[in-house]
Design a protein with these regions (language model features):
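Substrate/ligand-engaging "lid" and interaction regions
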Residues: 2-61, 66-67, 71-74, 78-171
């Protein structure tokens, strides 16, 4: 999903609690996505930042408050742990700002509904619907087992599909 958003012109901010991953991203100007299959190619992703969500909570809140899109790819069982940070970022959005699109890109049916319920539990205001929209997604991209020495680089199959429900964007 990061590659797709980067190719669409979005600035990426990665957030995780894994020190080694975040430090690696912070200390590198780029990472490569190796697409394998009928039309193999390598794309270098640049222009991103990375935050340790356990150690840089204020910075993460600010990043979410300024974001156009927030996606997760952590596993459906982890959504309850990332929801407080997302709720804090939504609450910090300036009044009148466009709604942030929140999408859980998980291997779960209606993963965004799961995330939305967790965000609602952590959101104290009554204006969540004015500040955020939540759209379920289905991501179809096979990510084979990665080589132990791959570092930040990732190998994926070149076929992909990212279906996003449209009703939350209507109106």
């Amino acid at each position: 999903v990061g590659l797709l958003l980067s190719n669409a012109g979005y600035d990426l901010v990665f957030a995780d609690v894994a020190d080694a991953l975040i430090e690696g991203l912070q200390n590198s100007e780029s990472y490569s996505v190796h697409e394998v299959g009928d039309d193999p190619r390598t794309t270098v992703v640049r222009g991103y930042s990375a935050l340790n969500s356990a150690k840089q909570a204020a910075e993460l809140t600010d990043a979410i408050a300024r974001a156009d899109v927030v996606t997760t790819a952590v596993g459906a069982h982890i959504l309850k742990f990332v929801a407080p940070a997302i709720a804090a970022g939504i609450a910090a959005r300036p009044a009148g700002a466009a709604r942030v699109a929140v999408m859980a890109c998980e291997n779960a049916i209606n993963g965004t509904d799961i995330l939305k319920a967790e965000v609602e539990r952590n959101y104290s205001g009554d204006d969540l619907a004015d500040r955020a929209l939540f759209a379920n997604t289905a991501v179809d991209r096979i990510v084979p087992a990665q080589a132990a020495d791959a570092g930040l680089d990732v190998t994926v199959e070149n076929y992909f599909e990212w279906a996003i429900e449209t009703p939350p964007f209507e109106g």
